Amino acid sequence: MLSMVLPFMVSAATPEGAEIELQTNVIDLGVLSQEDDKQIVRLSYSNTGDLPLVVTEVATSCSCTTVKHSREKLMPGERGSMTIAMDPAKAPEGMFYRVLKVYSTARSGVKHITLKAEIKN
């Protein structure tokens, strides 16, 4: 009976697929004025899985934040990056929190990045 259970346990512990690991999942831009220039952040990520990874979309929740990213395949072990731009002039005054959703072919599903700042007039 043990020989039937052991192969199942081994295969369950090593699923195949792409996996995305973000450099960070929180970006703190600090205190900004609505008159400040766009804030540009480059965020790196890597494919820690064993199949190719493609970032298919990075969704933002407001017009003050944009993201540019590559849609090229990342082989296992390779790194990529995305450029996140936030325009304080388009952000409301006060504490600013936005969640970016990273959609990819990773087996773990959608990853979230929190962008935060304090916006002053």
Question: Where do the language-model regions lie?
Answer:
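Beta-sheet-dominated interaction scaffolds and their linkers
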Residues: 12-48, 119-121
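Short strand-edge motifs at loop-to-beta-strand transitions and within beta-strands
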Residues: 27, 78-84
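Short, solvent-exposed loop/turn segments enriched in Ser/Thr/Gly
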Residues: 35-42, 89-99
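Buried hydrophobic-core signal for structured, non-transmembrane domains
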Residues: 41-47, 84, 98-103, 115
